[in-house]
Design a protein with these regions (language model features):
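N-terminal presequence-like segments and adjacent domain-start helices
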Residues: 1-12
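Amphipathic alpha-helical interaction surfaces in cytosolic regulatory modules
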Residues: 12-38, 43-91
Length: 93
């Protein structure tokens, strides 16, 4: 399954907005997906990604699903945020 992060916007900021995105994703996109299914999180088209938004979305996805791959992470904002999550929240992707 591929999750297109840009569907939630191209400027992704704030913990409340991230929580709302995760709840929508959980209700409509990932609800019936087995935890063993490979998940690809695609950041194509995302201009700004903050650690607070990503911590509400990416971290719980990585905790729930066993096989998560990140796509199109070349953007410097996306890279910096992912590095921050890896450092401070033990993100293992």
């Amino acid at each position: 399954m591929i999750i297109y992060v840009k569907k939630f916007g191209d400027v992704l900021v704030s913990r409340p907005a991230g929580r709302e995105a995760f709840l929508a994703m959980s209700a409509y996109i990932t609800r019936d997906v087995p935890t063993t299914e490979p998940i690809e999180i695609d950041f194509e088209g995302v201009k700004v990604l903050t650690p607070s938004w990503a911590d509400e979305v990416i971290t719980p996805l990585a905790e729930r699903f066993k096989n998560v791959t990140l796509l199109h992470t070349e953007n410097s904002s996306v890279q910096a945020t992912l590095n921050t999550l890896r450092k401070y929240s033990d993100l293992r992707i």
